[in-house]
Amino acid sequence: MAKSGKRLEELVEELAAPHAAALGLELVGVELVKEGAYRYLRVYIDKEGGVGFDDCEALSRVVDAQLDEILPNPPYDFFEVSSPGLDRPLKREADFARYVGHKVVVTTYAPVDGQKSFVGELQGLVDGRVTLTLTEGKGRGQTIALDRKQVASARLYVEF
């Protein structure tokens, strides 16, 4: 927990969001992960046309400086700012709205009609249900609606 009693991710999100907006960036998310012996605090940003090194560096400088002030002994070893990647996760309602018509892969916690992974064109998130038209696998061409509570993850689908 951070000093204020908030989770570190929430604190960083509140701190970074206005700076990201001022730079014309969208704050996609914040995560604290352990990889091997190290803990990484990662801030993910995006913008129309994609982000570049200069965007990441600009946000990193201002947020890292503020974190140094409020967290003299940070609970992480490395701070990173980056793009969410081509296969970016869809977490917020705004993410689902932004990527309507795009190909996505949705994974459920438990099998639905015998499967846990669905690839299709995102139709939207309406009334707590993720709707997609399947483009691969069992049920190809069908439109399905999954309760958002069933969804373990949703990501943009990358084709090579």
UniProtKB/Swiss-Prot annotation:
Keywords: Cytoplasm, Ribosome biogenesis
Regions annotated as coiled coil: none
GO biological process: ribosomal small subunit assembly; translation
Domain of life: Bacteria
Main location: cytoplasm
Any GO CC annotation of this UniProt entry: cytosol
Annotated compartments: Cytoplasm
Similarity field: Belongs to the RimP family.
Task of the protein: Required for maturation of 30S ribosomal subunits.
Name of the protein in its database record: Ribosome maturation factor RimP
